[in-house]
Regions:
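Intrinsically disordered, low-complexity polar/acidic regions
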Residues: 1-160
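Short beta-strand-to-loop transition segments that serve as allosteric relay/switch motifs
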Residues: 164-166
Length: 166
């Protein structure tokens, strides 16, 4: 818990909302717990949104960090959830046993603001969309106006940033 506390304190300014550990896919540990006790007992494999479940399966099968979202949650307008599956040789004879998943919940607006991507930029209209073409920041119309674009890949998730002059 002290590791989670120091990580949370250092990253809170950049939009970190919570850290959750789910042994066997069921959330057992959440930091900070006092603001998100409803997450304890949540079964990522049974209760989660189908897209979220698919991303968790992808994290397990690929053994890479997988970014989900954005999702509207009760405690933030839109969040991204980064999932990392953990494996333990103790869990299975072949040494590849799935222990569970650690997820980090990130406030999307806070992350974009920390990165300097805000709608208040004076000379540009900005938008960001994920690999499923869902716009997560800005207006979808920006992509229809011949924008300058850049692709950003975070682990196995791609994002497209677009900008047009105002």
């Amino acid at each position: 818990l002290s590791f989670a506390a120091s990580l949370y304190t250092d990253a809170e300014q950049s939009g970190l909302v919570a850290i959750a550990a789910a042994p066997g896919g069921v959330v057992r540990y959440v930091f900070p717990l006092e603001h998100r006790p409803m997450l304890v007992g949540y079964d990522l494999h049974a209760e989660a949104d189908p897209g979220l479940r698919a991303d968790i399966v992808n994290a397990i099968e690929s053994r890479h960090l997988v970014l989900s979202g954005p999702y509207p949650l009760g405690f933030a307008d839109n969040v991204l959830i980064a999932h990392q599956a953990l494996f333990s040789p103790v869990q299975s004879p072949d040494g590849v046993g799935y222990w569970g998943t650690v997820s980090v919940i990130i406030d999307l607006e806070g992350l974009l603001t920390q990165a300097g991507i805000t709608e208040e930029l004076r000379d540009l209209d900005l938008a960001v969309r994920n690999q499923h073409q869902r716009v997560v920041f800005g207006s979808a119309g920006i992509f229809a106006h011949d924008p300058v674009t850049a692709s950003v890949t975070v682990s196995e998730t791609s994002w497209e940033l677009a900008a047009i002059p105002i």
